[in-house]
A protein has these predicted regions:
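Conserved, single-site charged/polar hotspot
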Residues: 1-246
Length: 246
């Protein structure tokens, strides 16, 4: 669209209380998974893993600001569960290094405090709200209300999993939760999953799932993705499914 990185940021993190601020006290180190990195190293390795060096420069710049903001909110102490990270990246991309220099220390503030800036490389046509993704009250993050158009190319993937494989994933989930959250599957696998509500991000038949039933339990689509399927297996909670009997 020819947007600047500032326009990109204020499009996705959209609220009158959001502003772009320059940090006057940069950290000397950032900790990721127990290891210390210089700020530039951390930004580069994270951006390389998330958007890569071939993305438009303004997009990479906006990514840098989101990364820095996210880390600042975490007091620059991150774990492997926080985000993607490419350890092998060694400062060899001119676009990534230029984006670091152009935005170093810039972050998004919400009425003066670092905003919560989860980031992603692609969306299914528009963004999902924080309430859809994590639950809770939308008032906690009013600048993550969803519905923001996201014009990058969409990636469609097909995942095939047997009923036995899904049963094992449910059993693994049940072993980690208390009895009130354990899933009981019906005898017929065709009845195991039902999508109850989604935001129609891709049309009336597909969107980010805010409510679904698996067995006897109801949960958010992102909870199903993260806690049962695994984030690396099911890459998004914007999905449809079909069941084919053996």
């Amino acid at each position: 669209r020819g947007w600047t990185y500032k326009q990109i940021l204020l499009h996705y993190y959209n609220n009158p209380g959001i502003s772009l601020v320059k940090d006057s006290n940069l950290p000397s180190k950032v900790t990721y998974n127990g290891k210390s990195y210089s700020l530039a190293e951390y930004l580069g390795k994270t951006a390389y893993a998330e958007v890569g060096p071939s993305a438009p420069l303004e997009s990479i710049k906006s990514q840098m600001v989101a990364i820095y903001t996210y880390a600042k909110r975490q007091n620059f102490k991150m774990t492997t569960s926080n985000h993607a990270f490419r350890e092998s990246y060694a400062g060899t991309s001119s676009s990534i290094e230029n984006a670091i220099k152009a935005t170093l220390g810039e972050y998004l503030a919400y009425y003066g405090s670092p905003a919560f800036t989860p980031y992603f490389s692609t969306a299914a046509g528009k963004t999902a709200s924080s309430a859809n993704v994590w639950g809770g009250s939308q008032s906690s993050y009013p600048y993550l209300a969803g519905g923001r158009t996201s014009p990058e190319g969409n990636v469609k993937r097909t995942l095939t999993i047997s009923s036995e494989e899904l049963r094992k994933k449910v059993e693994a989930y049940n072993a980690k939760v208390d009895s009130s959250k354990r899933i009981t599957l019906q005898s017929n696998p065709a009845q195991w999953i039902k999508i109850l509500e989604h935001d129609s991000a891709r049309g009336s038949s597909c969107g980010y799932i805010s409510s679904m039933r698996i067995g006897n339990q109801t949960m958010r689509g992102n909870a199903f993705r993260l806690n049962i399927m695994g984030a690396a297996t099911l890459r998004s909670h914007c999905f449809t499914f079909t069941y084919t009997p053996d």
